[in-house]
Amino acid sequence: MADTYVGSIDQGTTGTRFMVFDHSGQVVANAYEKHEQIYPNPGWVEHDPIEIWENTKEVVTRGLEEAGLDAEQLEALGVTNQRETTIVWDEASGKPVHNALVWQDRRTTDRVEEIQEAGKVEMIREKTGLECDAYFSATKTEWILDNAEPLKMQASRGGDVRDRAEDGELLMGTIDSWLIQNLTGNHITDVTNASRTMLYNIRELEWDDELLEEFRVPRSMVPEVRPSSDDEYYGHTDADGFLGAEIPVAGALGDQQAAMFGQTCFDEGDAKNTYGTGSFYLMNTGTDAVASDHGLLTTIGFQMSGEPVQYALEGSIFVTGAAIEFLEDVDLINNAAQTAELASSVDSTDGVYMVPAFTGLGAPHWDGRARGTLVGMTRGTEKEHIVRATLESIGYQTRDVAEAMEADSGIETTSLRVDGGAVKNNFLCQLQSDILQTDIVRPVVDETTALGSAYAAGLAVGYWDTVDELRDNWQVDREFESEMDSADANTMYDRWDDAVERSLDWAQEE
């Protein structure tokens, strides 16, 4: 009998990855495809949902072929995804009425300020655990319903989009819903993705009528909410479809919650930080939805079938890896790997600070009008100083969140599990440890986002029996301990606060 595995579709901000894992959590197949980033106006970011679905089929097919696997060898499929990114589509045709509005998109900032001025921020925070921000799906959905021109997509029927939504003809969802719909024909999301819409009550665990009314989103549009690991399955792939097999789709988590699951942060106080386009620091708070007084989000960490929801505190940092991409865009570096060499060639930034607020600042500042700032330059400043300042900004932003996390939870983080593409950079990991004054632990399998959704799906179908098996799979690649004097780290961090102040409230209303 052929060996069996679990597959994971990891749909991210810049591309789509398909990975297959064996029982020990090791990677046996891996394929990736980038998709286009669409910038119609300053501060606007879109993706083409059709391109994402086509790429998904491509990477799944190619990943299996290159590894010499048959689809029938997959016991389950899990899905993980860039969160908050929002799609509205025609239920009958399955075609989107507009491009997806990406989590980074800031076009609804004015609407958010309207809500803030109306004094509704506290109500939203109490129900959803979220700051009222353009980051989340609620204002994105509202914008699409008010502004989409579906005929431009050459894919969906014309007619007033809002009227059609009110008539029950349109569906909305985050990327997981879009993929699950295309994989199984069912309109489903999981609790972690629902918790990022700003429409879902994380304490009552249901779509909130008051919020649906506030953002004028008809209840008929929203997906059914299910556990992250669901032994009743979300559905099966079509035997006559692109895979040619009926495979249970049984696990889904937003990418950051999936990384937490893949890092086996199953216990209260466990924390991880994922370094991607942005950085996302999550701490498991158990069955208690801890309210934040320090600009963090209260969110759902995960839910297993038949078990209570596990909550988390989250610090969402909008720009970390994207700051490295910026250095490439302006030709300061040729590729990301070059950053360590350039940054380590100087002892310090020589007083230069980079605040990479290209799309505003997330936790704990929440300023949609903050903008990227480079301060402290002199005629002696060289590109090496700017590159180092950019890497240091990742550490400072992480410390902003770590200090807020400790204040809210009362738990001191002595060890932080890290993952994501950037953690392959030893210099960056050491820098993080120095600035945070905390041990940084890098696991052997660093694609923990894909691993987390595979674990969720595999648990649902019995491929793994307990989370203890998953804990046994987790292995340390390297641990980084601080080599910097704490007084020096604190002095540098205090100066970072000054730099952040200069970036705030910069963008003017149009």
Swiss-Prot record:
Record function comment: Key enzyme in the regulation of glycerol uptake and metabolism. Catalyzes the phosphorylation of glycerol to yield sn-glycerol 3-phosphate.
EC number of the protein: 2.7.1.30
InterPro entries: ATPase_NBD, Carb_kinase_FGGY, Carb_kinase_FGGY_CS, FGGY_C, FGGY_N, Glycerol_kin
UniProt family annotation: Belongs to the FGGY kinase family.
Catalytic reaction annotation: glycerol + ATP = sn-glycerol 3-phosphate + ADP + H(+)
Record's keyword annotation contains Transmembrane helix: no
Binding site for glycerol: 83-84, 135, 255-256
Protein name: Glycerol kinase
Enzyme class: transferase
Binding site for ADP: 13, 17, 277, 321, 421, 425
Annotated pathway: Polyol metabolism; glycerol degradation via glycerol kinase pathway; sn-glycerol 3-phosphate from glycerol: step 1/1
GO annotation, biological process: glycerol catabolic process; glycerol metabolic process; glycerol-3-phosphate metabolic process
Organism: Haloquadratum walsbyi (strain DSM 16790 / HBSQ001)
